[in-house]
Amino acid sequence: MTNKKFVNALGKIPQSVPPIWFMRQAGRYHSHYQNLKTKNTFVELCKSPSLAAETALGPIESFDFDVAILFSDILFPLESLGMGLTYSPGPKFDQLLTEENSHEIFNNTFDVNSLAFQGEALER
């Protein structure tokens, strides 16, 4: 599903109308998101590639935006670094990031496959 306006913008090709997308476009206001949320947790929507893709594409279909934004959470890489992320209802870490432990946490290696669900969602 290639969008010409977006591809042209990436190629710096002049056009009469720029591509349109919004951050958090699959938000709480959107009925498509609300319907998915009644059957799935936030984490399920993010970590299931098919659900993440469906969530991201909802606003494209409803509002005719030009570009979809990956439906995910910015905190998942920190979870992969061993910080123990849970949602109840909002995000909570098992350990806090401090000046004292930041060097150790950010120098941890992690299996990049722990974030494979994000790449799989993009492929859909």
Please give the residue ranges for each predicted region.
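A gly/proline- and charged-residue-enriched helix-loop-helix capping module
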Residues: G90-R124
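N-terminal basic, low-complexity leaders that serve as flexible interaction/assembly modules and, when applicable
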Residues: M1-S80, G84
